Curated annotation (Swiss-Prot):
Associated pathway: Protein degradation; proteasomal Pup-dependent pathway
Homology family: Belongs to the prokaryotic ubiquitin-like protein family.
Domain of life assignment: Bacteria
Comment block on domains: The N-terminal unstructured half of Pup provides a signal required to initiate unfolding and degradation by the proteasome but is not needed for pupylation, while the C-terminal helical half of Pup interacts with ARC to target proteins to the proteasome.
UniProt gene name: pup
GO process annotations (BP): modification-dependent protein catabolic process; proteasomal protein catabolic process; protein pupylation
Numbered residues of crosslink Isoglutamyl lysine isopeptide (Glu-Lys) (interchain with K-? in acceptor proteins): E63
Subunit text: Strongly interacts with the proteasome-associated ATPase ARC through a hydrophobic interface; the interacting region of Pup lies in its C-terminal half. There is one Pup binding site per ARC hexamer ring.
Residues in coiled coil: none
Region of interest called Disordered, as start-end residue ranges on this chain: 1-28
Protein name (Swiss-Prot/TrEMBL): Prokaryotic ubiquitin-like protein Pup
Length: 63
């Protein structure tokens, strides 16, 4: 997975605040490293025990 960045524009009303707005316009960064590690772990488990995983999933009422 790739890291995603979302820019959130800062609002304002005065033109002389333009430089401050540009500097204070925030970016939200989502760290997906933990999610990638978890998905890698799940992939590893499925490679070794896919049949058992499916059986237990169906027994628990999964669709």
């Amino acid at each position: 997975m790739s890291d995603r960045q979302t820019q959130i524009p800062a609002g304002g009303g005065r033109e002389d605040d333009h430089d401050d707005q540009v500097q204070s316009a925030g970016q939200v960064q989502v760290n997906t490293e933990g999610v990638d590690d978890l998905l890698d772990e799940i992939d590893g488990l499925l490679e070794n025990n896919a049949e058992e995983f499916v059986r237990s999933y169906v027994q628990k009422g999964g669709e």
